[in-house]
Amino acid sequence: MSNAREIRSKVQSVKNTQKITGAMELVAASKMRGAIVKMNNVRPYVESANTIIKNVTAASIDYPNPYLFDRDVKRVGYIVISTDRGLCGGLNINLFKHVLKEIKNNIEDRVGVDVCVIGSKAENFFAKLKDVNIVATAHYNDKDKEGSIRAIGGAVKVMLDKFTAGEIDRLYMSSNQFVSTIKQRPRLQTLLPIQDIFSAEEIKANKEKATKGHWDYIYERDIEEVLNALCIRYIEAQVRGAILENAACEQAARMMAMKNATDNASDIIDQLKLDYNKVRQAMITQELAEICSGAAAV
């Protein structure tokens, strides 16, 4: 058993660590609230872009937009959004396990895989995989938002260009979904083709409305250019929204991880204090025994 001085030193060390984790919990909570506001602000834009694409597509049903129609899948692409920093529990590893399962299924079906990674954790993880081809990387830095946005936009454009050129036939995005402060879960959604924005009922209704002249648009450019640009903006907005949502997940997970660390530190301190009291009790008992032995000898 350690002596009393060593135990006191350990208690002080754990208390210092507890102060750090407590401060990190407060910082993460503050950042999480800001991230949630940003996440909620971008959603109306994505929803509006979705509605516009529906209306424009319905008004031009004769144009076979390449972003809206499915095709035979020979190669797929993934945009994986992770964090740049750690200390956020199992947030990243749970996401990687989820997307890796899908990637392995594609590889078993002899479907090629290209990956665009956003975040250093995803970059480090997928760089170790032999059967996965990383075609683009990007990072999001709060201190250089404009530079980060340009880098992410460039990485996403690489995947869009590969889809347009027919090098990949389907594009997915893997990120974390913010359910609540204490719950975040991995999510895999299809970015391209974006035909999923229409249900069968909507397609039928849109065709009827278009036939009746319900929407009558006048375009400054060709409908092809307008619709293609809208689809690209829609995809970019989805990725942007996913990055902001993933940031909220990161701060929520870090807040909970630091809270658990702070609580565990309290338990460790209590146990160390118990050990300290046992050591002191043993020392006092030994001293009393020595005193009694000395008195008996006299």
From Swiss-Prot:
Role played: Produces ATP from ADP in the presence of a proton gradient across the membrane. The gamma chain is believed to be important in regulating ATPase activity and the flow of protons through the CF(0) complex.
A Pfam family this chain is assigned to: ATP-synt
Membrane protein topology class: Peripheral membrane protein
Any single GO CC term annotated in Swiss-Prot or TrEMBL for this entry: plasma membrane
Identification of the protein by name: ATP synthase gamma chain
Assembly, per entry: F-type ATPases have 2 components, CF(1) - the catalytic core - and CF(0) - the membrane proton channel. CF(1) has five subunits: alpha(3), beta(3), gamma(1), delta(1), epsilon(1). CF(0) has three main subunits: a, b and c.
InterPro entries in alphabetical order: ATP_synth_F1_ATPase_gsu (IPR035968), ATP_synth_F1_gsu (IPR000131), ATP_synth_F1_gsu_CS (IPR023632)
GO molecular function: ATP binding; proton-transporting ATP synthase activity, rotational mechanism
Family label: Belongs to the ATPase gamma chain family.
